[in-house]
From Swiss-Prot:
Family: Belongs to the universal ribosomal protein uL16 family.
Lineage: Eukaryota, Rhodophyta, Florideophyceae, Rhodymeniophycidae, Gracilariales
Pfam families assigned to the protein according to its UniProt record, in alphabetical order: Ribosomal_L16
A GO cellular component entry from the record: chloroplast
One function term, GO molecular function aspect: structural constituent of ribosome
Keyword tags: Chloroplast, Plastid, Ribonucleoprotein, Ribosomal protein
Species whose genome carries this gene: Gracilaria tenuistipitata (Red alga)
GO biological process: mitochondrial translation
Keyword Ribonucleoprotein: yes
Protein name: Large ribosomal subunit protein uL16c
SS bonds (residue pairs): none
Subunit structure: Part of the 50S ribosomal subunit.
Amino acid sequence: MLSPKRTKFRKQHRNRMNGKASKGNTIAFGEYALQTLEPVWLTARQIEATRRTITRYVKRGGKIWIRVFPDKPITARPAETRMGSGKGATEYWVAVIKPGHILFEIAGVSKQTAQEAMKLASYKLPIKTKFITKQ
């Protein structure tokens, strides 16, 4: 699964997810893409499950690009722990996604194949997405 090799700081604030994506909202590498319509924290597990779904559907047909990376650590405390004594340990990593961000791109396959692969992939995600093509 995806996670940073090293970070400047071990823990982060949660922060807000206001507005739309200003970067990463156009197709850069492939011909077809999966674009988000809602804000979300995508976990490394969700990204990996989606990647595997697309890869299995297109087999060796096309090239796939993952346009997101989980670089935000989410901490959690053990169950039944008293308050205090600092912030919990890093539990998992998430990618902060705003509406309009491109998640996956695909090239080298037909439009029908790409559309079906992205449809199956969208079932693995907790948000609404849309299939877009390069102009």
